[in-house]
Amino acid sequence: MKNKVAIIGKGNIGWAIKELLKDTYEIKQGDITEGFDARDINQVREFLKDVDAVISAGPFAINKNIGTVAAELNIGYFDLTEDVETTDFIRGIKSENVMMPQCGLAPGAINICAASLMKDFDHVSEAMMRVGALPRFTTNEMSYYLSWSTNGLINEYCNEADAIYEGKCIKVMPLEGAEKMIIEGESYEAFNTSGGCATMCETYENKVDNLSYKTIRYPGHLNHMKFLFNDLHLKKNKDVLEKLFDKEVPRTTNDVIIFFVKVIGEIDGILQEKTYLRKIYGDDRFSAIQRTTASGVCSCLEMYFKDQIPKKGFTKQESILWEDFTSNQFGKVYL
């Protein structure tokens, strides 16, 4: 008998998750466009009463209700959120089953990969996680088209980010910390955005010297965002900014994911570096952001049903083995 999985959210990522899982699991999917409102906790209780696990693929604001009910019903819980406050709430829920937020691309797969690379070192001087969800071709001044949740994008650009500096956890400002990158001969820029470190800063505080996550974009994007968010103070009017982006910034499925981890440290007394780089493209079925994000949470779900992750309580991304994550039919997209 197939395990029954509920997917809440039927947008681009929710659809992709269902497409990946439908041959292996019995799927039950709900969305506000079909009358299911996850903001109503009683509707959530009714929807989840007969499933083995739930994936939240909707806006992060609904995750608190879903996580609360998942714990009540003793079912596995997974989400994709980059929102730190929501993750802290999920962490505080007492459950006899797995509670695993942040199971997408970044946070998610990037943290699992970085933790795996760091294990090779006797001492880590610096761990750098860099991810970009980029259009393959752009002609606008932003050098950017939308390929995923506008709400999630704005949230990442507005909130403080976590990092480790000289062994201690710190907060850094979004849209700051700009750096130039050259990857396989092509120029990019990277800067601070929130959520990408997940829980790694608390895990590695006093264990590594420096650790950071930044978002990759084409050169010039950051200056335009600082003008909108800071100079025009639109970070205080997120609803206005979201409507503006959705109306005026084109959406694309012709995208590429740049997945980059670099770790510098000592191995047997010698300073060394190791890098993991993948460029992941879309195909006729999925865009690149759909493939990577949906595959991340689907791989975690598969590991859950194979008893490869703990079955009780809050589970950190960095506690997952990269070898297990990439060995199943979903996680192999990152190889």
Language model feature labels by segment:
Residues 5-9:
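Conserved N-terminal Rossmann-fold NAD(P)-binding element of oxidoreductases
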Residues 24-37:
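NAD(P)-binding Rossmann-fold cofactor-contacting core
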Residues 13:
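Hydrophobic/small residue at the entry helix of a nucleotide-binding pocket
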Residues 52-57, 78:
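N-terminal Rossmann-like NAD(P) cofactor-binding module of classical short-chain dehydrogenase/reductase
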Residues 39-50:
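Conserved Rossmann-fold cofactor-binding substructure of NAD(P)-dependent oxidoreductases
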Residues 69-87:
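ADP-ribose/adenylate-binding Rossmann-like module
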Residues 120-335:
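C-terminal catalytic/substrate-binding lobe primarily of soluble NAD(P)-dependent oxidoreductases
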Residues 81-101:
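Rossmann-fold NAD(P)-binding glycine/threonine-rich loop
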